[in-house]
From Swiss-Prot:
EC number, as in UniProt: 3.6.1.-
SUPFAM superfamilies for the chain: Nudix
Positions of transmembrane segments: none
Domain of life the protein comes from: Bacteria
Protein name stated in the entry: RNA pyrophosphohydrolase
Classification via PROSITE patterns: NUDIX, NUDIX_BOX
PANTHER family tied to this protein: ADP-RIBOSE PYROPHOSPHATASE, DIHYDRONEOPTERIN TRIPHOSPHATE DIPHOSPHATASE
The Nudix hydrolase domain, residue ranges: 6-149
MF-aspect GO terms: pyrophosphatase activity
Classification of source organism: Bacteria, Pseudomonadati, Pseudomonadota, Gammaproteobacteria, Moraxellales
Xref: InterPro entries: Nudix_hydrolase (IPR020476), NUDIX_hydrolase-like_dom_sf (IPR015797), NUDIX_hydrolase_CS (IPR020084), NUDIX_hydrolase_dom (IPR000086), RppH (IPR022927)
Catalytic EC class: hydrolase
Length: 173
């Protein structure tokens, strides 16, 4: 679903373990890592889409996770011009996302799999909460920062998770 401004409705998933680390997934055929995310289908709520994407991309069911928080507003990013498909209608110039923070207890990590439906990832790892800010593709970095900052208070193990400075784009984790 693309809105009147050209932004595709989408959900992003930050899946945290009980140590406050987050699941960081590698896209098939690329040296690109990101959080699971995906589009909202017509008739779906963001929550419905999040659970569908959780199953399709990571192989987890709602019973495997606890929902901790959701971003209050839509977070938007624009695609660089080279990624915009100008022959497509309606024209999509970026994504607007609702971000979900989920907790996955250790026993349920055994259910993570990438062979459900059309696989998008082929590897994953647990990383520190702020690590993705220094690794994600540049045009998603602002949305990742806003989502992580908004959701960190809801992470049970937030002690010691310092919010990085806004202007520090060479983050070391």
């Amino acid at each position: 679903m693309i809105d009147a401004d050209g932004f595709r409705a989408n959900v992003g998933i930050i899946l945290a373990n009980t140590q406050g680390q987050v699941l960081w997934a590698k896209r098939i055929g690329h040296n690109a890592w990101q959080f699971p995310q995906g589009g909202i289908d017509r008739g779906e709520t963001p929550m419905d889409a999040m659970y569908r994407e959780l199953w399709e991309e990571v192989g987890l069911h709602p019973r495997h996770v606890d929902l901790l928080a959701v971003t209050q507003d839509w977070l938007r990013y624009r695609l660089p011009k080279r990624y915009v498909r100008h022959g497509q209608y309606p024209l999509c110039i970026g994504q607007k996302q609702k971000w979900f923070l989920l907790r996955l207890d250790e026993p349920n990590t055994q259910h993570i799999r990438f062979d459900e439906g059309k696989a998008e990832f082929d590897n994953w790892q647990w990383v520190s909460y702020w690590y993705p800010l220094g690794q994600v593709i540049h045009f998603k970095r602002g949305v990742y920062r806003r989502a992580l900052q908004e959701l960190v208070p809801e992470l049970p193990l937030q002690q010691g998770l310092i919010i990085p400075e806004q202007n520090n784009h060479l983050l070391q984790f």
